Amino acid sequence: MAALFKPGVLTTDGKALLAKWQAGGTAPQITHAAIGSGSYTKTEDASTRTSLKAEKLRVGISSATADGDTLNLRFVFSNDNVTTGFSVTEVGVFAKDPDKGEVLYSISVSADESVADFFPAYSGNHSVSSIFVYYIKTSNAENVTILGG
C-alpha cells in the first residue's frame, strides 16, 4: 500500500513569508526539502511547526518548473548516507525569509502512519532513492528564486 499524506499546509512562518512575497518586498526563495519520521495525531495542527519533529534527510531541489502560478518542485532523497532505516511520516519545504533566515515554509504529514513508506538504510550494495514532487502556489510573485539543488 502506498503512503498517504495529508495535503501540504503553509506554516505560520510560511504564511508570513507569503505575505512578504505578495507585497513585493522580496522574491520567493525556496532552499531545500527535508523528510522525517515524526509522529502526529490526527487532529494536530502541523501549520504551527517551525521544524520537522524528527528530520532524517535534507536535500536541495533537483528540478523546478513553473506552471502558471504553481511551482512544481522535485526532490530526490537517497539512502547513501542513511545508517538506520525509518518510516517517512513528514515532508517539509524550507524557504529563505529576509528577516528570519531559513524557515519551514510548508509541511505535509502522514495521513496514516501504518502505511508510511519505509526508507531503508544503505546496504552497501544498492542505493534507494525516493522522489517527492511538491506543488506550491506563488500567486502575485513576479519572480521565484530556487536555491541549491
Residue ranges of each PLM-predicted region?
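N-terminal assembly/attachment segments of tailed bacteriophage virion structural proteins
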Residues: 1-148
